[in-house]
Amino acid sequence: RQRQMCIRDSNRYYKKGEHNMIPVYAISTGKIETLNYDQKRPMHSALNKTMFSGKMWLSYTGFSEDEQAYKDHGGPHKAVCCFSKENYSMYKNDINILPDYAMFGENLTLVDLDENDVYFGNQYQLGEAIVEVSEIREPCWKIQRKYGIKHLVKRMSSSGKTGFYMRVLKEGYVQQQDHLLLLKTAEFPTRLSVQNLNDIYYNDRENIDRLNQAINNPYLSPKRIEKLKLLKEKAMNK
């Protein structure tokens, strides 16, 4: 109830496009545990996250009480995982009762922030910390296993509604009532949205012009640039 009141207040005072405030519905962390969604093949994951109380330290590698079972899910360029609560509705016909927050193991469940409106290099204040959009999210088979939705990973990837990651530029404490305050928007010459990169990476892998646009973005992680260069090389050799 307290979180819902906070969100109502944030929607009232920080309407979309006003004050550069992006309401956060929940901030969540999780520990690695054994999950038995498939009795034949238990999996180790920190997918099931819960909201924390009080304040928590956000370091260059993520929240102090958050863990990742797979090394590629974390690191300095994937310190904070974000997902829009608005996109939960894409799966309302697949799941009887949609989770209230952290449906896909994200740290920040945003009230409504479309991937078309999120650019790599955007910087936000979150509590005492400053974060920057740095990576797309590549949906993992574990979320498909959890919900038992056929082709969930493919559906999410092709839609472009994957959520995204942020790196931490300034460490600091974060509390549940904190929201994202836009400090800087990526520059026009190299502006690239999460939706655009998802479309390139998942749906348009042989478009060399678009691949070049993405490769030249100064804010993407080195690993993402490597993957894009490999796609370009394959496209040119076809």
Each model region followed by its residue ranges:
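Double-stranded beta-helix
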Residues: 143-161, 165
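Short, small-residue-biased leader/transition segments that mark boundaries at the very start
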Residues: 1-7
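Electropositive, beta-rich accessory/interaction domains or terminal extensions
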Residues: 13-145, 151, 186-238
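Loop/turn positions that initiate beta-strands
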Residues: 121, 171, 175-178
